[in-house]
Amino acid sequence: MIQLTNINKTYNNGAPLHVLKGINLNIEQGEFVSIMGASGSGKSTLLNILGILDNYDTGDYYLNNVLIKNLSETKAAEYRNRMIGFIFQSFNLISFKDAVENVALPLFYQGISRKKRNALALEYLDRLGLKDWAHHMPNEMSGGQKQRVA
């Protein structure tokens, strides 16, 4: 599903900083992967590339057998929306929307009807043990509950 071959990334802020050097990685569908390393080792840069939030300089990145290079913003957003999930270290919920509405929001951008969005969001919340919190606002939830909703 994800294949990186010889990925390189350099930031040019005055002196060039080569943060990723020859990264090779294969992740199959259904695998759970952790990216670990020392501070400043390039973890966030790698994750930003995997999430199609940043470009790489050289190498090849294939997502579902599609080369991820020089995509239009529209195409990149489509792939992010349909094929990539994020769990951010810091997260944000929309404060004036309840748990169902926050969970359903990405489905809106996929053109799914409100009825189906809400049904799917309730199903996801149930899987996370949060069905009883579906209509609670973020300020009524614990930090852990908010993390799961996000």
Task: Tell what function each PLM region has.
Residues M1-A150:
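ABC family nucleotide-binding domain
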